[in-house]
Amino acid sequence: LEWAKKVFPNAASDEEAVDLLWDQIFKTCRVYEEDPVKAWEEHAAILKSKADMLNKEQFSALHYTAPGTDLTLGLPKNHVWESAGAINAQGEGFLPNMPTEEVFTAPDFRRADGYVTSTKPLSYNGNIIEGIKVTFKDGQIVDISAEKGDQVMKDLVFENAGARALGECALVPDPSPIS
């Protein structure tokens, strides 16, 4: 309920906020498509083609820029971009994560430099965290703050050394329903 009210603060009632949230989830998961299975197959094929193209390019780094963001992430040699699909033990294709809109890879954990500001809230362990700003140097978080939930965010990041480095980076097209 708290998340529904956060996403739809102008809903007339708690029930309407929850209904609106479910409606968005169903749209994002392509449930309303005439043939949802076909829609997901086509979408997965597009994501796979993007991952294949990125794998051929083998960029050395990604540079993210936006208001409040200027972050360069180094990519390891021979990195692999993945997309939506996976193969189970029986050799059958499936989508383990829905909705999925991104292609993703693992960055070089030693090569993250700059800062990023979150444009969306984060829900962690029952806490809503907003206005997150993270600064990286040589792959490690050196500063982090949040307008709301600052201490929760700091505790999350500084509870172990591994939490201070990035383990994944993703590319999501701007018109995506989750961007």
Kindly give the residue locations of the regions a language model identified.
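Active-site bordering "gate/hinge" segments
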Residues: 1-113
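Short, glycine-/Ser/Thr-/acidic-enriched flexible segments
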Residues: 2, 69, 78-80, 121-123, ...
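Generic serine detector
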Residues: 13, 49, 60, 83, ...
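Weak global preference for isoleucine
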Residues: 25, 46, 71, 87, ...
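Short, solvent-exposed amphipathic alpha-helical segments in soluble enzyme
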Residues: 78-80, 88-90, 132-135, 158-161
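Long, well-ordered mid-to-C-terminal structural blocks that present hydrophobic/aromatic surfaces
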Residues: 103-155
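Dual-mode signal for accessory low-complexity, basic/Gly-rich regions
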Residues: 113, 143-179
